[in-house]
Amino acid sequence: MIIKWNKEKDELLKATRNISFEQVVEEINAHRNTKPETNPVHQNQFITVVKINNYPCVVPFVIEENGDWFLKTVYPCRKMKGRL
């Protein structure tokens, strides 16, 4: 599995949320038990929850036909504190 993302979106996330897709990938690789769940808002997407800067963050993504993950965005979510 390869994890991909849009470079422009990554720069926007760094500037606006102080979070990068590189941090997400590091967290996913460090915790192999990261389980994709169906995104309740977008049925064609999945989500996973990772901890960035000691705070839970939701990462929506799509799984491509070859099994690669394409990250859409990442956002902090206090509602997920109990999940980590």
Describe each region flagged by the PLM.
Residues 1-84:
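Ribonuclease/tRNase effector modules and their secretory precursors
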